[in-house]
Every structure is written in C-alpha cells, then in structure tokens.
C-alpha cells in the first residue's frame, strides 16, 4: 500500500506550508490525481486523516480531483484519451491496462504518447491564521 508513503509526503508538505504561513488550522487540501497514478483516493484520504489526527490538519477536508489521461501525437493532436472507447473495449482488470490498450490517436489512429494522467499535485491548501476574522 503505497498510499501511506504518498500521504506522508502530502502531510509533510501541507504542514510545512501551514507553518510557513502561520496557520492555526488547515481547513482544506485539494489534490489533482491522475487516473493512471495507481493511487486509491479513499485509501489516501484515510492515511492522510490518520497522520493529521493530532495536528492542526485534524479536521481538514482532503479533496481529490481526478485527472483523465491525455495524449499527444506526431500528427499534432493533443487531448484526452477517449474514455468512451475504453469503457466499450475494457476487458482488463487493471485500469492502466485498459488505457494502455487504446493509446492511439483519435485523429489519425497511430500510437500516441501518454502526456498526462499519472500526476499527483497539491493544487491548494486552505488555512486559517490567528489574524483572520
């Protein structure tokens, strides 16, 4: 379960940022998570909450925005993977295998390069400070 190590990294970054800005409470943490990151949002949230239990982030909401995979092709196409096609053709247990099986350009049909969908980014951290009313 790599979610624990990822949650530790996120928690450390959140706490470092909160301290840097004089936070008294962390209210919300918003993440952008690629669908191909092989990270379970529920497990990640659970691990984060366990780590945050006795900190200023104990009541923080962890909001996860899922990012679909994106492609780039030598024909010039840049855009999202056709998820409808994946659902129609998905016979695999692993979501990654399903996406990998259709990494072709929707314009020309040639193999395309995966350019997004594996990222995990802290998009925003909402904090409260003593000076806030």
Swiss-Prot record:
Kindly state which keywords UniProt assigns to this record, in alphabetical order.
Metal-binding, Nickel, Zinc
**Residues annotated as binding Ni(2+):** 2
Q: Which GO terms describe its molecular function?
A: nickel cation binding; zinc ion binding
Q: Which domain of life is it from?
A: Archaea
One GO biological process term is:
protein modification process
Task: Name one matching Pfam family.
Answer: HypA
Would the keyword Calcium turn up in this protein's UniProt record?
no
- What InterPro entries does the database record attribute to this sequence? Hydgase_Ni_incorp_HypA/HybF_CS, HypA/HybF
Instruction: Detail which positions bind Zn(2+).
Output: 73, 75, 105, 108
Gene3D superfamilies on file: 3.30.2320.80
- Keyword Glycoprotein assigned to the entry: answer is no
Q: Which PROSITE patterns match?
A: HYPA
Family the UniProt entry places it in: Belongs to the HypA/HybF family.
Q: Which NCBIfam families did the record assign?
A: hypA, PRK00762.1
Role, per record: Involved in the maturation of [NiFe] hydrogenases. Required for nickel insertion into the metal center of the hydrogenase.
Q: What is this protein called?
A: Hydrogenase maturation factor HypA
Species of origin: Methanosarcina barkeri (strain Fusaro / DSM 804)
């Amino acid at each position: 379960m790599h979610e624990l190590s990822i949650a530790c990294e996120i928690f450390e970054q959140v706490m470092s940022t909160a301290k840097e800005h004089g936070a008294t409470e962390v209210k919300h943490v918003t993440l952008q998570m690629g669908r191909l990151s092989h990270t379970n949002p529920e497990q990640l949230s659970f691990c984060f909450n366990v780590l945050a239990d006795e900190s200023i982030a104990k009541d923080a909401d962890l909001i996860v925005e899922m990012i679909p995979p994106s492609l780039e092709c030598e024909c010039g196409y840049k855009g999202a993977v056709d998820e409808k096609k994946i659902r129609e053709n998905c016979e695999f247990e692993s979501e990654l295998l399903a996406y990998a099986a259709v990494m072709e350009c929707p314009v020309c049909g040639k193999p395309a390069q995966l350019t997004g969908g594996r990222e995990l980014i802290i998009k925003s951290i909402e904090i409260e400070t003593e000076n806030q009313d």
